[in-house]
């Protein structure tokens, strides 16, 4: 299961040994670290973040040269609010290397990602679901090429099959 999770993450997000993955707490939840497994598979580095404030996140991305950050909706919203309210200025941070932000575990409002892209237009984005249900991240994910479909559940991930059934168990 763990090896498949690593292969799925690497397939979905193209991690290389040069990536630096920001692991955000709580580390007792598998999502905080299993999304890093694609980087682990390729020899990529992880940074363990202490705290989830917008300033802490941006400082870590800047100082540690993080390329991939996994967030939850509230953390992304808090970060955008801090930027909107001019509490933080992205010009104060070295963020050019940051290439991918992905979210999972809960519905993602399309307006959130649209707003995110206003500040970070070069970022790839993915939504991941199914970690708790399947012992591996990305059993269902949006896919980095499908940002126009944010809000949808996504597609079956690498090595997974999925089907939609009705109340009688019939494929629809």
List the predicted regions and their residue ranges.
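Alpha-helix capping/helix-boundary segments
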Residues: 53, 74-76, 108
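Gly/Ser/Thr-rich phosphate-binding loop
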Residues: 41, 66-71, 80-148, 158-161
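Conserved beta-loop-beta connector loops within the AMP-binding
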Residues: 163-172
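Active-site phosphate/pyrophosphate- and oxyanion-stabilizing loops and adjacent acidic/basic residues
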Residues: 7, 77, 114-115, 151
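AMP-binding (ANL) adenylation modules
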Residues: 25-28, 133, 170-171
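Conserved AMP-binding/adenylation subdomain of ANL enzymes
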Residues: 3-20, 28-68, 82-83
